[in-house]
Amino acid sequence: MTKKSVQNDYLHTILGYLSRYRMLALPGLAVMALIALGQLAGPYILKQIIDVAVPKEDTGLLLAYAFAFLGIVSVTGLLSYVGMMLLARLGLSIVTLIKQDLFSHLLKLPISFFDKHPVGELMSRTETDTERVRDMFSNLGANLIVNVLTMIGIFGVTFALVPRLALIMAGVSVLLLTVLIVFFSKIFSMYEKARSFYAAIVAKVTEFIQGIEVLKAYGRTGWAETELDAAAKQRVSLEVRISLIEYTMMSVLESLIGPLFIVALLLLYAPKVLTGTMTLGMVLLFVEYGARLLRPIAEIAESLRSLQQARTSLSRIRKLMAIAEEPNRGVGKAPSLDREIRFDHVWFAYEGDEWVLRDLSFVIPKGSFAAIVGASGSGKSTIISLLCGFAHPQKGHILIDGVPLDEIDIVAWRKHIGLVLQESFLFPVSVLENTRLYHEEISEAKVREAISVVHVDGAIEALPEGLATNLWERGANLSSGERQLVSFARALAANPKLILLDEATSNVDMTTEKRIKESMDVLRKGRTMIVVAHRLSSVLSADRIFFLSGGRLIAQGTHES
């Protein structure tokens, strides 16, 4: 993609969001134009006071100009407030929309995407980067619009009075802006690198907090601190370099070029006052306009710096939004499970890896209890992922009543699945909402029935507020066995057609395992159930047992056979 096309895409994205909130953007733009007009009118009124009211010694005219000046300053201040409020609301509205679009897109990405991207990196995209974009649409946008309109107004008024001076001002402004634009384009890569350093730090902090138990248990908190400190120092070093370059440029502009420009104006036009070819008010107007011209140039330069950062953030967001969503070719095709689940010569491998499943074929009739047994790495859990549509076979087909799974609406299909993993995730919300996952159609009575069936009702009722008790992070105020039983209750409350248990009993004690086996007897009634297990002893009651080794089906049958 060429630099021009990237720029066009960038502008297209900005205009796309602005068009959706034009009822805020257009009034905001109009107010910014009035503010720029007010900033031009103030110095002109002072010129009239010096050139007209004072020579005439007309007190009434002097007071009229003074009140006009006061009125313009007051109205400009009020308009600044209104304009900032409009653009702040615009920025909030747009960033909310971006966050909604981004989060909605994240939810539609395949599971494999989340395996490759740290949580901290995604948090940086959804929060930090979006807030920078918000700043672009509110504060930066307001400053840039006012400054650009002010510059245009200064050129216009000056050209009407002294065309030669207007051309000089325009030439100096174009030269300075060109230098600044080239300067900021050269250090754009430094901004991108600084943002990547920040994202890496957020990712490290997130990972270290998630793995705090392991770090403490192995005495590696010191190493984690050193790692984070090194990453922070790397970022600080780069940020200091960027700031040094920026401040050097801005200091040259404000402390050297600005005063030289004002002195040049005075040397050029002050003598004309002595010869009577120009009024004192006119000279002071040009000096004031000259000073006001340099200020917008400096502020535009500062805005360009922040806009570059916002552009980097928007670029990251757009890259994330461009990632292909999870395929769902069967949208609208309602799934069913009236006869069987069939694996027909299925081959599967993870990206760039060896085959995990090799020419796998088997049939699981509706309403049966099937067990998949094998050593670690034999492909058992991969079968669960394929059935959930989290991954897709490279060769062969998974058929639901003869229909390929990739031709069924995968979102609708998942609603018929009750999934219990080896380590099921519990949210930091109430036990009630953890069990029904905010499905309002699942009543509290249904939830109570489910937790009773899986024999975790006693533990839940012992909590301070029973079902209404908020769980700690990852359900830490429950034992591991209780957490797993809540996951079983979640599967039961959803009343699915298909139950998938992936090593659901491998991390629990004997008492909890006994409860789980009793729960499985209830869960399987009227449903199809597939259980992945290491130990054959945990699935003795299965209707059909499939033995995997190296991704191949090496045997199948009942326990008796």
Segments predicted by a language model, with ranges:
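Short intracellular "coupling" helices and adjacent cytoplasmic loop segments at the cytosolic face
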Residues: 2-4, 92, 100-124, 128-130, ...
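An intracellular "coupling" helix at the cytosolic face of ABC transporter transmembrane type-1 domains
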Residues: 15, 20-23, 111-112, 128-137, ...
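Hydrophobic alpha-helical membrane-associated segments
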Residues: 34-38, 42, 70, 75-87, ...
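A hydrophobic transmembrane-helix motif
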Residues: 41-43, 47, 141-184, 240-284
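Hydrophobic transmembrane alpha-helices
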Residues: 71-75, 205, 283-303, 307
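Cytosolic ends of transmembrane helices, especially the final helix of ABC transmembrane type-1 domains
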Residues: 197, 220, 244, 293-320
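ABC-type nucleotide-binding domain
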Residues: 336-561
